[in-house]
């Protein structure tokens, strides 16, 4: 699959480094997610006053909304060190045991894609999260024995795009569960202006708003689009990102005014033209457009549902009248 400029996943190590350079250090610097921030401010202050570790935190929502950044900010606000890993990287119980025994009092352990932990790994986490202890087995066969090791108080922050895949026992052990929502156009405009300042890029308010409008409610996409539009401003303009230049650049990048690219349009056209608007099953859509089912579920569908272009029903996906209008296709409602 070709790289999508509006993909909400990080595409390479360079982009990871770029995102790291943009990250805020405090909750006051973190733009958006106000409900989540307000609650976390109280929880962090209360834990600090009691000289306790913050309750374990689960952050869930579509990719690119700032779950990793928020984990870093929480650690910073707590004055704690943070150790990061991911579900796929923890393959064996020994991998997790090594990480847990290296923690210092008050540390934050961040596990991205926590829904991809195996059940065997999850079972090691249960006593670690509840009682700050680690049960390990020494030896094999008849001589094997279980030894319990004490762990220092720590905070586990888990991030996932698919909270429904977490087992109930693991999910129930998180004291704080927060859903990150898509960002408003105003919030994304503020993010674009902030990033432009860090990049020393000249941009006016209307130029920033045009980029924000096409960023699918996602800061990661907004920052990526800004970098590409900046290139057009330097090569084809006078170095300043204006509304006119942003529109021209984003049109050339095949990102339409609602943030849809050719893959999104292909998905909607397929539902409308090949399946009479639906309902049609996700596996059928995936096979028709040559995408993985999981890619559609995680990367395309959440935004299309958010803006009202798709409906999800027990019988399958349906393209809405709004989607027809956006694509310039006549909508005939079935009687």
Curated annotation (Swiss-Prot):
Cell compartment(s), UniProt: Cytoplasm
Q: Would you name any one GO CC term?
A: Holliday junction resolvase complex
Print the keywords alphabetically. ATP-binding, Cytoplasm, DNA damage, DNA recombination, DNA repair, DNA-binding, Hydrolase, Nucleotide-binding
The catalytic activity of this protein is classed by the Enzyme Commission as: 3.6.4.-
Task: Describe the reaction catalysed, as an equation.
Answer: ATP + H2O = ADP + phosphate + H(+)
Q: What is its main location?
A: cytoplasm
Q: Where is this region: Head domain (RuvB-H)?
A: 257-335
Say which domain of life the source belongs to: Bacteria
Residue numbers spanned by region Small ATPAse domain (RuvB-S): 184-254
Q: Where does Mg(2+) bind?
A: 68
The answer, when asked if DNA damage is one of the entry's keywords, is yes
**What is any one GO biological process for this UniProt entry?**
DNA repair
For the ligand (DNA), the binding residues are 293, 312, 317
A GO molecular function term, named singly, is:
four-way junction DNA binding
Cross-referenced Pfam families: AAA_lid_4, RuvB_C, RuvB_N
Its domain comment says:
Has 3 domains, the large (RuvB-L) and small ATPase (RuvB-S) domains and the C-terminal head (RuvB-H) domain. The head domain binds DNA, while the ATPase domains jointly bind ATP, ADP or are empty depending on the state of the subunit in the translocation cycle. During a single DNA translocation step the structure of each domain remains the same, but their relative positions change.
Query: What job does this protein perform?
Result: The RuvA-RuvB-RuvC complex processes Holliday junction (HJ) DNA during genetic recombination and DNA repair, while the RuvA-RuvB complex plays an important role in the rescue of blocked DNA replication forks via replication fork reversal (RFR). RuvA specifically binds to HJ cruciform DNA, conferring on it an open structure. The RuvB hexamer acts as an ATP-dependent pump, pulling dsDNA into and through the RuvAB complex. RuvB forms 2 homohexamers on either side of HJ DNA bound by 1 or 2 RuvA tetramers; 4 subunits per hexamer contact DNA at a time.
Would you identify the family this protein belongs to, as annotated? Belongs to the RuvB family.
Q: What is this protein called?
A: Holliday junction branch migration complex subunit RuvB
Give the organism, scientific name.
Listeria welshimeri serovar 6b (strain ATCC 35897 / DSM 20650 / CCUG 15529 / CIP 8149 / NCTC 11857 / SLCC 5334 / V8)
Question: Per UniProt, what is the name of the gene that codes for the protein in this document?
Answer: ruvB
């Amino acid at each position: 699959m070709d790289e999508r400029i509006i993909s909400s996943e990080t595409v390479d190590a360079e982009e990871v480094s770029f995102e790291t350079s943009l990250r805020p250090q405090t909750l006051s610097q973190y733009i958006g997610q106000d409900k989540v921030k307000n609650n976390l401010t109280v929880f962090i202050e209360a834990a600090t006053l009691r000289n306790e570790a913050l309750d374990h935190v689960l952050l869930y929502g579509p990719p690119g909304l700032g779950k990793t950044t928020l984990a870093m900010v929480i650690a910073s606000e707590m004055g704690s060190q943070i150790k990061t890993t991911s579900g796929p990287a923890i393959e064996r119980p020994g991998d997790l045991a090594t990480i847990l025994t290296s923690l210092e009092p008050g540390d934050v352990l961040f596990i991205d894609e926590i829904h991809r932990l195996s059940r065997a790994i999850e079972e090691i986490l249960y006593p670690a999260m509840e009682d700050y202890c680690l049960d390990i087995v020494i030896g094999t066969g008849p001589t094997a024995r279980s030894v319990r090791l004490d762990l220092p108080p720590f905070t586990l922050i888990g991030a996932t795009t698919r909270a429904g895949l977490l087992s109930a026992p693991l999910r129930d052990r998180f004291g704080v569960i927060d859903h990150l929502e898509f960002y408003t156009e105003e919030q994304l405009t503020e993010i674009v202006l902030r990033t432009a300042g860090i990049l020393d890029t000249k941009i006016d308010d209307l130029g920033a708003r045009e980029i924000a409008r096409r960023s699918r409610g996602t800061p990661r996409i907004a920052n990526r689009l800004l970098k590409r539009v900046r290139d057009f401003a330097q090569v084809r303009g006078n170095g300043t990102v204006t509304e006119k230049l942003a529109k021209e650049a984003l049109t050339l990048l095949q990102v339409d005014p609602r943030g849809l690219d050719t893959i999104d349009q292909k998905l909607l056209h397929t539902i409308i033209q090949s399946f009479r608007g639906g309902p049609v099953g996700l596996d059928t859509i995936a096979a028709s457009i040559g995408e993985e089912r999981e890619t559609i579920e995680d990367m395309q569908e959440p935004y299309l549902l958010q803006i009202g272009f798709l409906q999800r029903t027990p019988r399958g996906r349906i393209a809405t009248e709004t989607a027809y209008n956006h694509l310039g296709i006549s909508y005939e409602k079935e009687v």
